[in-house]
Every structure is written in C-alpha cells, then in structure tokens.
Regions:
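C-terminal accessory helical subdomains adjacent to catalytic cores in phosphodiester-
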Residues: 1-5, 16-36, 43-63, 68-170
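Helix N-cap/beta->alpha junction signal
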Residues: 11-12
Length: 170
C-alpha cells in the first residue's frame, strides 16, 4: 500500500510532530508520509499558508492539516482568519485544527503518556480539563520538573513528540 502524503502546517516542528503522531495513531492500518511547514507564530501562518499549500500540493500532498493554537483568541476569529488565508486551497482535502489554548493541553490530557515517555518515577495527577489552563506549556514544564525530582527540564522540541507517541487515542 502506498503512503498517503499529508501536508502539515503548524506553528513549530513540535506541533507538526504531535499532529503526525496523532494521525498515525488514529489510523494505524494506513501508511502516511508527512511534509511540513512551520510558521513560528500565527502571523506567518496567516501570511504564508496559501503559498505553502501550493508548495505542498506540488510535493504530492493530497491532504492538508492546518493547525494554529487558539491561545486567547475567539474560535470563530481564528477559523475565519485561517479559512480566508488558505482559500481557495490548492489541496481540496484539508482540515483546520485549532487546539484550545495550545497543543500542550492535549498532551496534559494523558498523565500516563507523560510518565511513560519521559521515564518519570511517578504518574502526574489527572488534570480534568487541561484546555481550561491559561498556560498548558508552563504547567507541563513545571509538572515534568517536579515529578522528575528536579532532574529533568522540559524541552518542547523533543518531549512533545516523545509524549505524543504514547498518547491514548480514544
């Protein structure tokens, strides 16, 4: 079976790593190949996503995932900005993904994945609604530092992908 080539546009490499891992976990019988662009912030994604979509189409992508953290914006505003910036999309099969606050909230939803991926001595307490946290990235950083008995520092560029590999998709 040939791999489905999917374009991923996100804020940074750790976001596209997490998205690619989640896509693979959600569809374990399919093979995927990912091609990416990173905006390093919202402004660049808005300004470049249409051009990047064309580039990804030219690189044989048949599907596109465009991701932007909600941060403190309104959902409707972010969706409209991304749709207006992307359309007309040169890749017809696309979706816009907007993590509430930031993608680290998704990671915080699975305490066992955090423990396993980072080899922590204990499992963090469950966080009932991680998307309600104002700064999930800081919470994750503090949690890892504390649970590692102050031996490990959180590095989102490496740790997010490691944790995503252990996330339970239900």
């Amino acid at each position: 079976m040939m791999a489905k080539v999917v374009g991923l546009i996100g804020e940074d490499e750790s976001d596209t790593d997490v998205l690619g891992t989640i896509i693979r976990k959600a569809s374990p019988t399919r093979r995927f190949k990912f091609k990416t662009f990173h905006g390093h912030g919202k402004g660049k994604i808005i300004g470049k996503c249409n051009q990047w979509a064309k580039n990804l189409r030219d690189r044989e992508c048949t599907a596109l995932v465009l991701a932007q953290d909600l941060d403190e914006e309104s959902y409707a505003k972010v969706v409209n900005e991304l749709k207006n910036a992307l359309e007309p999309s040169t890749i017809a099969n696309y979706c816009i993904v907007i993590p509430v606050r930031m993608i680290e909230a998704w990671i915080l939803s699975d305490a066992e994945a955090i423990k396993t991926a980072l080899n922590l001595p204990s499992t963090p307490n469950d966080i009932p609604n991680p998307e309600s946290l104002m700064d999930p990235k800081s919470k994750l950083r503090d949690l890892i530092y504390t649970l590692s008995q102050k031996r490990r520092r959180y590095m989102l560029t490496k740790d997010n992908g490691r944790i995503a590999a252990h996330l339970r998709i239900e």
